[in-house]
Regions:
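Terminal, compositionally biased segments used for targeting/anchoring and flexible tails
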Residues: 297-423
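Hydrophobic/aromatic residues positioned on beta-strands within the core alpha/beta folds
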Residues: 119-121, 293-294, 314
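Conserved phosphotransfer microenvironments
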Residues: 13, 42-45, 49, 65, ...
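Short acidic, S/G/P-rich loop/turn micro-motifs used as interaction or catalytic elements
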Residues: 37-42, 74-76, 88-99, 123-125, ...
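As written
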Residues: 100, 130-141, 305-312
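Non-catalytic signal-transmission and effector/linker regions of two-component phosphorelay proteins
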Residues: 1-69, 133-140, 144-223, 229-231, ...
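Conserved mixed alpha/beta core segments that line enzyme active sites in large multi-domain catalysts
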Residues: 431-471, 520-925, 942-945, 976, ...
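A structural-propensity feature for long, helix-poor, extended segments
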Residues: 479-529, 536, 843-851
């Protein structure tokens, strides 16, 4: 029962991550060697010590090798110290003089905090001279045996001492206590010990997710602390007892330091069993700390082994090898070896954390109990710098473990939680052997992530830095599982297949696509794709992520393709579809619309590079269809605030099904995250019936046709009634009661279902408003500008444990900046007389002043206008737009209905490239053709980001003004069946107030 309580307690526990970047803050960068020229040359052994130390550092994966400066006199030392921050003084006393000691004393007198060590080749003469010197200024004395790695060991020993307190407090870093008074011996054993520990730290650094993290992770290696007498060892142990990885002790050493007591030199004899006294004390205090006794007196072996200590014979020719074997076996280095407690036979060998996770349920119970009850797993994790899991398990395993299976679950859950925590906010280097269902975000290649990739990484980091996202029981907040093919993969694909000549030609889009589909992606990525399919087990969105896309200053949102690939258990079929989708996204860089966009934004097409985001599609499967419960686009600026809303409170457009429905301009639900109970579209019954969602998008899971330039070829548009049959509307629908002429909150039998989101917005079924507010606030603060965020939610039918509604998942899919004009507008537009205005809108999008447009293009819409002509009008406008691009001119565009809608009955179905030269776009209502303000979509993101105004007017309802008669009276520069282009001699003045949502176009003076 107790173990189950522990497991339940663990399930609600959040691990605290370790910031390795904060460790090892104090380093030795500059070393002053005090020696006569001959002794310094001997140290360098006919070569440069800098070069040798540099080679030592690089071979062990270390950074920041120190620089060495050699001086012989006090004057030389003073000059170096005047110009350089010296971190360590190495004193090398010569065989014939004591000048080095004199210089060292002078340095220490002026700089008492600089560590000083003695490094000397031992001889009887030097030993006697040292005995007669005042050695109190020196931290350590070392015996030079000709090995350069002793210098490295000295530096690391002092760095460890400088960082010990901080790093233990910051991260729980472990330490190895070495107790030894023999200068010659510790000068020999320290280089071996450090080279082993540093090599092991390189090995455990592979637990990191990318090279940068691996380098930082090495800072979490165990530190080495040297004690030279019993009192010093006891002080160190008692101070750091909770962070001792293990102890290596000599047997015979002094009880106290050889310093003066009561003014006289104290006799400081060595005590033959000082090591036993020390180890017995430690063993009583903590029986789980591994203890190694090393002694030249073999008589101590039997006593040491009887007490449970490991013994290393100092006289052995392979003493250093024996010591390494004991370290690997008992200090947690190397592989973790599960053994049979009776026979000590190897049961299972574990190389890394993922292998422990994969095998924990297969370890025999007696073996698992043997190791957990002795703290072995916790120590192994500590040695690998996996401190959060180690510290938690250490508290569990000190108890009597009765329920071994519960303990397996605790270990498994701890590892899963840790891996999840470490994955969040980190772009890992993709490793097919380690990428699994608990992995998160990885990249293939070394190039750029592109716009969407960067945005996803940024969102992931926001979630990691703000733990309040995880405050809701049973609600997971995350980004979807993602792998990014970096831009260097694109370069390799284009170069190896010689595609640039075709891509940059004027070939039709479909022909460009066919050339790209026939090209080959490198086979080396196939195994990576298979690993990703296995880990996701869901449909995959293949999304463009270009260098220019979602730029802070030039938004390319929606210019390139996004394909969705349904999941199938046939991995080769899946591979074919995903690879074709990747090639199709690459091809979309060179489509006609993309080239037009590049021209409009003054970018060069062959400078664009494409990364590709492979991302699990958020959703749930319902028969042959797959879609999320809720998709949304969230903007931190609301250009259409109503009642007590403000522009700064933002706006969300929510819909049932895939988010492409919102991007395509479908009928979404506009919601203020700060006023979720006030939804304009639900304020009156007739509005709710007319202005809410009737269709939704879903991915068809059956194998469809081959890829085309239309990236929505396998997206089905379904009636909302279909979702009712799927059970998706339970918490997001209201029900129309035709008999009583009322719309009721909630899902009831019979009656038309209205997508109102009432369960999540008004009744607390799911904390969507809170999550929207957090996302908007943290995203805008992180980017330091207004943002647009795409999101999706899956709602479960399972009730949350806290009784607050249902469990669910909230995914952030993309973030990009809303680039607004910084131009000041210090005028009240209401004060401008109507007779000065060509256009006036009380519902405008955009901000700023423009005085360089002379042209107006408008649709010749009469009262009997038919929306059936809209596709034709779009083509006519495209032709005119091309003329403006060629002449590098802008224009004001006026037309009926909603611009850019994929449904031509709602408005003129233009793409951005067809109107890319427009500076103001006006949607004008007609008596028989009512228009409501459009939602924020990719299309309008581009308009507003480039300073283009967007006006909505309905003059027949006295909502805004359009002085069409002025234009009709002017001669046409160009005229088609449905569209006129007129030009003023002087520029029009365009003024937009983005806060008040007002805009005017003034006639020339």
């Amino acid at each position: 029962m107790e173990q189950k309580n522990i497991a339940q307690q663990w399930s609600k526990m959040v691990l605290k991550d370790v910031s390795f970047v904060n460790l090892m803050q104090h380093r030795i960068y500059n070393v002053l060697i005090v020696a006569n020229p001959y002794d310094a040359f001997m140290l360098e052994d006919d070569g440069r010590v800098d070069e040798k130390i540099f080679n030592e550092y690089t071979s062990l994966g270390l950074r920041y090798p120190p620089l060495f400066r050699q001086v012989s006199t006090t004057e030389e030392a003073a000059e170096v110290l005047r110009t350089t921050n010296i971190d360590l003084v190495v004193c090398m006393p010569g065989t014939a003089d004591n000048d080095a000691f004199n210089v060292a004393h002078a340095v220490k007198a002026k700089f008492p905090d600089i560590p000083c060590v003695v490094l000397t080749p031992f001889s009887h003469g030097i030993t006697r001279r040292i005995e007669n010197e005042d050695m109190s200024i020196f931290d350590y004395v070392f015996c030079w045996l000709g090995n350069t790695n002793l210098i490295l060991s000295i530096i690391k020993l002092i760095e460890d001492r400088m960082n010990l307190d901080h790093d233990i407090e910051e991260a729980g870093v472990q330490m190895i206590l070495l107790v030894e008074d023999s200068i010659r011996f510790y000068s020999s054993v320290l280089p071996s010990l450090y080279s082993y520990i540093l090599a092991q730290s390189q090995r455990f650094a592979t637990e990191a997710l990318n090279p940068h993290s691996a380098t930082l992770r090495m800072r979490g290696r165990p530190k080495v602390v040297l004690a030279r007498n019993h009192a010093e060892a006891m002080y160190i142990y008692n101070r750091y007892r909770d962070n001792v990885l293990g102890v290596i002790s000599d047997c015979r050493f002094p009880m106290f330091a050889g310093s003066t007591r009561n003014g006289e030199q104290a006799a400081n004899p060595k005590v033959s069993d000082a090591g036993f006294q020390l180890l017995e004390y430690i063993h009583r205090d903590n029986p789980f700390i591994p203890l190694i006794m090393q002694s030249a007196e073999t008589v101590n072996k039997a006593r040491a082994e009887a007490a449970g200590y490991k013994f290393v014979d100092k006289n052995s020719k392979k003493m250093l090898i024996d010591l390494r074997q004991e370290l690997e076996e008992h200090f947690g280095f190397g592989d973790f070896i599960f053994r049979d407690p009776t026979t000590k036979a190897v049961v299972r060998r574990i190389r890394n954390l993922k292998e422990l996770q994969d095998n924990i349920f297969n370890i025999p119970s007696d073996s698992l109990l043997y190791h957990t009850s002795r703290n072995h797993i916790s120590r192994w994790l500590c040695a690998r710098a996996i401190f959060p899991v180690s510290n938690f398990l250490k508290n569990i395993t000190f108890k009597e473990v009765q329920d071994v299976d519960a303990h397996r679950q605790i270990i498994f859950d701890a590892i899963v939680e840790y891996r999840h925590m470490k994955n969040i906010g980190v772009v890992a280097l993709f490793d097919r052997d380690r990428f699994d269902s608990y992995s998160h975000f990885a990249r293939i290649g070394d190039g750029s992530l592109g716009g969407k990739g960067r945005g996803l990484a940024f969102l992931d980091n926001i979630i990691k830095r703000h733990p309040e996202f995880n405050q809701f029981e049973g609600v997971k907040v995350s980004i979807p599982k993602t792998v990014v093919l970096c831009t260097d993969v694109f370069d390799e694909f284009m170069d190896t297949n010689n595609l640039y000549q075709i891509a940059l030609s004027d070939m039709p889009d479909e022909q460009i696509l066919q050339h790209f589909l026939r090209a080959q992606l490198p086979d080396k990525y196939i195994a990576d794709f298979f690993a990703f399919f296995e880990a996701t087990q869901k449909p995959i969105a293949v999304r463009s992520s270009s260098l220019l896309e979602d730029s802070h200053y030039q938004p390319f949102a929606g210019v390139y393709a996004t394909y969705m690939v349904p999941f199938t258990s046939d991995k080769y079929q899946m591979l074919r579809m995903v690879v074709d989708a990747i090639k199709s996204v690459y091809a979309s860089v060179f489509y006609k619309d993309s080239k037009a966009y590049m021209t409009a934004t003054a970018n060069v097409i062959d400078q664009e590079k494409m990364a590709v985001v492979l991302q699990e599609v958020v959703g749930q499967q319902h028969g042959n269809y797959y879609y999320p419960t809720i998709s949304g686009v969230l903007r931190s600026l609301n250009f259409y605030p109503i009642e007590d809303e403000t522009a700064e409170e933002g706006i969300a457009s929510l819909a049932l099904g895939l988010g492409k429905y919102i991007v395509d301009g479908g009928q979404t639900l506009r919601v203020s995250p700060y006023h979720p109970q006030k939804v304009l579209q639900m304020s009156e019954m007739h509005i709710a019936l007319r202005q809410t969602q009737t269709q939704f998008y879903a991915l068809e899971m059956s194998m469809g046709s081959s890829f085309s330039t239309d990236d929505g070829f396998n997206i089905a548009s379904l009636p909302v009634k279909e979702a009712e049959a799927h059970g998706s509307l339970k918490y997001i629908a209201s029900t129309y009661d035709a008999m009583n002429q009322i719309v009721r909150d909630g899902f009831y039998p019979g009656g038309r279902k209205i997508v109102s989101m009432c369960g999540v917005l008004k009744h607390g079924i799911f904390p969507l408003p809170e999550l929207l507010r957090m996302s908007m606030k943290n995203g805008a603060e992180g980017m330091r500008r207004p943002v647009e965020i795409e999101l999706a939610c899956n709602l479960s039918s399972k009730r949350r444990d806290d009784g607050g509604g249902v469990e669910g998942e909230f995914y952030l899919l993309q973030i990009r900046p809303i680039v607004d004009s910084k131009q000041e507008l210090n005028m009240n537009l209401n004060e401008l007389a109507d007779d000065r205005c060509l256009l006036r809108s009380n519902s405008s999008l955009g901000h700023g002043i423009s005085e360089d447009v002379t042209d107006v293009v408008y649709v010749k819409a009469a009262d009997d206008f038919s929306a059936a002509e809209n596709p034709t009008i779009a083509m006519e406008i495209e032709q005119l737009n091309q003329h403006f691009i060629d002449q590098k001119r802008g224009y004001v565009l006026v037309g009926p209905g909603r611009w850019g809608s994929s449904d031509h009955w709602l408005g003129i179905p233009v793409k951005w490239a067809q109107i890319s030269a427009a500076r103001v776009i006006v949607e004008c209502g007609l008596p028989g053709y009512r228009v409501d303000p459009s939602q924020g979509t990719h299309f309008f993101q581009n308009l507003t980001s480039m300073g283009v105004g967007y006006f909505t007017i309905n003059p027949y309802r006295q909502d805004g003004l359009f002085n069409k008669a002025v234009l009709d009276a002017m001669p046409a520069v160009e005229e088609t069946a449905h569209v006129r282009h007129v030009r003023f001699e002087k520029p029009l003045t365009i003024m937009m107030d983005g806060v008040k949502q007002q805009g005017v176009v003034l006639l020339p003076e």
